Amino acid sequence: MAVRRLFWRVLVAGIPRRGVSVLIFSHRSFRILVGCALALAACEQPRTQVAVQSDDFGDPVRIGQPPTRIVSLNPVTTEMLFAFGAGSRLVGRSQFDLWPDSARLIPDLGNGLQPNVEIVLGAHPDLVILYASQDNRPAAARFRAAGVSTLSLRTDHIADFRRTVQMLGAILRDSARARAVSDSVFRTLGRVRAATTNLPRPTVFWHIWDAPLITIGAGSFMTELVDIAGGKNVYADITGPSATVSLEDVARRDPDFILAGPQGVQKISEDRRWRIVRAVREGKVLKVDTVLVGRPGVRLGEAAVSLANLLHPGTLH
C-alpha cells in the first residue's frame, strides 16, 4: 500500500521532488486540442437524460442534470474537463492539478488522497471526482451520504483512458466532444506505433524513485507507452503497475537505456553505485518530463511522441 501511495504521488500527482519535474504544456497546443474537439462536437445528448454509470469502485453514479459545480481531486480528470471546455465548472481541485495554467486559479482543496470532506463540501459541489484508491473509499461514502454525486476513477492502462473520457462525456451530456478528444489521442498513438513498428526495440529501465528504488511493471500504462514508442520495459514481467527493485537486479537485466526525471538523472550521475549498470557507464540515461508521461490523460499522444524521439531520435516531429 505504501508503494502504491507513493506511486500515485510521484506519477499521477507529479510532486516536483527527487526525479520529478513539473512542465506546463503550452496554451497554444491546448487551444488546438480543444479547438479540434469543438469542431467535431456537432451534437449533444438531451439534457434531461439521467446518466447512470458505475465508477471504478463499482458504485452507481446517477446525475439528473449536467453538473455545474465540480470538484476534481484527480489530475487526470481535471485535464480532461479542461479539454472538454468544462474548466469553468470546476470549483475545486487537488494541489497537484497544475495543467493547464488556468487550473491554478481554481481553489486548492488538498492532495487528492483522504481528502478533508468538510472542506470539499464547503465548495458546494454537485459532483466530486476522486482517484479510485482504497484510501479514498471512506471519503467517497461520506460524499454520497451527504447527497453529493461522486465519481471515483483510475486509469491504469491506456484503454482506461477511452472509458474515462466516455464516462465524463456522458455525465456532461457531451459524448460527441468526448469521442473527438479520445479519437485525437488514439490517432496520435497509432501514428507513433506505426512509425516505430519496424525499428529495433531497445530495452528500458524506468527510474521512478530512488529510496526505495521503484520502477514500473506491466500493470502501468507507462509500460504500454514504452512499447508504443518502440522500446521494451526490462521489468515487463512484473504484473503490477510498480515495484521496488534492487540496483543489482537492474544491472543484471542490463537495460539499453534508463529513463528518469531531471533530478533522477542528476541523482544517477552523482551516485557512483549506478556505475554497475552498463547504460550509465555508456551515458544512456535519458531525461523525461515525468508529469507529461506519467499522467494517462489528454496528453498521452504527446507523451508517446516524446518517448519515441528519445528512444529513436528524429523518428517523429
Question: Can you annotate each of these PLM segments?
Answer:
Residues 3-33:
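Bacterial N-terminal signal peptides that target proteins for export
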Residues 40-42:
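C-terminal motif of bacterial Sec signal peptides marking the signal peptidase cleavage site
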Residues 44-46:
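Bacterial signal peptide processing site
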Residues 50, 60, 126-127, 137-214, ...:
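Extracytoplasmic substrate-binding proteins
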Residues 54-58, 109-118, 134, 238-247:
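Short helix-initiation/N-cap motifs at beta->coil->alpha
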Residues 69-123, 127-134, 139, 234:
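A short, structured surface patch at a secondary-structure boundary
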Residues 94, 218-242, 286-287:
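His/Asp/Glu-enriched short active-site or ligand-binding loop at hydrolase and phosphoryl-transfer sites
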Residues 117-124, 146, 244-254:
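Short helices/loops that flank or line small-molecule/ion binding pockets
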